[in-house]
């Protein structure tokens, strides 16, 4: 099966968001604006409480989904429907903003390490005004597939070729979301089909993809093909993200992602008038 080539490698961009939370943006930057259906990917990894205590106070979303994956630490989520919960170490929350939600994401700790990711996934026009909803799972509910050489694959969304299925369905874009750990010298291979866009987010160690060596905190955007192949130069951890492109216009400003300019303007108007 054809191995996917590398289209582009982009080093993550240090920035801050919310109330001063320090993070590295790996998708959603001038160098990598989006990769249909994925809009943005942030990695946050802070040992100093001052770099995360401000959290993400109340803010709106419409027209897409947010996926929060915690590696270390605890994050409390509250929204304007009265829903509340905590995402703990290894846990996942896949939230559909749909027609609109106002929520906060605040650290449930005042010391220790806070580490994880937030991914934004676009929705097709037919689902942008759907009802908000959640899929939430603790780490014990997320399967880990063991492979030769000590390679492990934590399957959050979708399923591996051998049938290990994550607790979250792929949704409208048939998304795959795998967290792969590779000991030095090992290889990870996975067919993802040639109808998905696929990217890698290297967040620990150093890997080789095709003919390129990739350092930590880099995004690797892959070309057409069937199989994703990663070689570990050192012990490494990598997210594999793949999804079917939506192929529709994207009008995106701040927390709203719509398919028309009129829809984007309406989102701002609805929020300002308290219609969320």
UniProtKB/Swiss-Prot annotation:
- Alphabetized Pfam families for the sequence: Pirin (PF02678), Pirin_C (PF05726)
Q: Which SUPFAM superfamilies match?
A: RmlC-like cupins
Provide the family line. Belongs to the pirin family.
| Species the sequence originates in | Caulobacter vibrioides (strain ATCC 19089 / CIP 103742 / CB 15)
Family annotation (Gene3D superfamilies): Jelly Rolls
Q: Which InterPro entries match?
A: Pirin (IPR012093), Pirin_C_dom (IPR008778), Pirin_N_dom (IPR003829), RmlC-like_jellyroll (IPR014710), RmlC_Cupin_sf (IPR011051)
Kindly provide the name given to this protein in its UniProt entry: Pirin-like protein CC_0481
Source organism, top-level taxon: Bacteria
């Amino acid at each position: 099966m054809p191995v996917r080539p590398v289209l582009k490698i982009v080093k993550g961009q240090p920035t801050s968001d919310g109330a001063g939370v320090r993070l590295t943006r790996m998708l959603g930057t001038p160098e990598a604006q989006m990769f249909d259906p994925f809009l943005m990917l942030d990695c946050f990894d802070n040992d100093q409480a001052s770099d995360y205590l401000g959290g993400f106070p109340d803010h709106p979303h419409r027209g897409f989904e947010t996926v929060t994956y915690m590696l270390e630490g605890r994050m409390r989520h509250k929204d304007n429907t009265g829903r509340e919960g905590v995402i703990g170490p290894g846990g996942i929350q896949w939230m559909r903003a749909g027609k609109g939600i106002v929520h906060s994401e605040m650290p449930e700790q005042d010391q220790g390490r806070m580490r994880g990711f937030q991914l934004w996934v676009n929705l097709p026009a037919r689902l942008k005004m759907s009802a908000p909803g959640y899929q939430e799972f603790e780490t014990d509910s997320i399967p880990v597939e063991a492979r030769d050489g000590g390679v492990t694959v934590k399957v959050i969304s979708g399923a591996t070729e051998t049938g290990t299925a994550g607790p979250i369905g792929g949704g409208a874009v048939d998304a795959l979301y795998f967290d792969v750990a590779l000991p030095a010298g090992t290889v990870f291979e996975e067919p993802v089909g040639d109808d998905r866009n696929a990217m890698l987010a290297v967040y620990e160690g150093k890997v080789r993809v095709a003919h390129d060596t990739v350092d930590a905190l880099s995004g690797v955007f892959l070309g057409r093909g069937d199989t994703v192949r990663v070689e570990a130069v050192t012990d490494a951890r990598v997210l594999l993200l793949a999804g079917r492109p939506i192929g529709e216009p994207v009008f995106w400003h701040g927390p709203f992602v719509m398919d028309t300019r009129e829809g984007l303007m309406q989102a701002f108007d609805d929020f300002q008038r308290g219609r969320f």
